[in-house]
Design a protein with these regions (language model features):
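Flexible "arm" and connector segments at domain edges
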Residues: 1-162
Length: 162
């Protein structure tokens, strides 16, 4: 996965939106908004996959003309975009870029049967990254997010990049 190119694409998209909408805000406001957007996208990812809906027999929402797998991939990539944007806004790109070397190792991780604890840990670390300005917590949250996509959801690097 070309994480450098994905970061550049995320930053470009964000700048395009800001220019088109004529948004003028402080860096703090921009960062705060990106964290909220990521939180919402992660919730949408969970809601789309429906792993936590133990009462349902058939899990996984789908958009018209898409499979549940394609719909979930779309939500996953939306969330990834905000991780990448935050890494740039907070000058934490090195955490994302360092993870490039560990992708093969992450792909060897054990698939979780119940994603609840992993999801809550990912969100807890994300909130710690925001409230305590912790790059290490961001790094851990990012790596759990990669595991979700590459292991627990079973996407390939190519699927995620495309």
């Amino acid at each position: 996965m070309d994480l450098q190119a994905l970061i550049a694409s995320s930053v470009y998209l964000n700048r395009e939106i800001e220019a088109k909408k004529q948004l003028h805000w402080s860096n703090d406001g921009r960062v705060k908004n990106a964290f909220v957007a990521l939180d919402v996208e992660l919730a949408e990812m969970a809601n789309t996959s429906e792993w936590f809906k133990v009462w349902k027999v058939h899990r996984g929402k789908q958009d018209p003309d898409k499979t549940p797998r394609q719909t979930l991939l779309y939500e996953y990539v939306d969330a990834m975009d905000f991780y990448l944007l935050i890494s740039n806004l907070k000058n934490w790109n090195h955490f994302v870029l360092k993870s490039q070397d560990d992708i093969e190792k992450i792909k060897q991780s054990k698939e979780e049967n119940n994603l609840d604890k992993q999801y809550l840990a990912m969100k807890r670390m994300l909130f710690d990254a925001y409230f305590n300005h912790s790059g290490d917590s961001f790094n851990h949250s990012w790596r759990l997010f990669l595991k979700f996509g590459l292991v627990d959801f079973g996407y390939t690097e190519d699927e995620i990049e495309t």
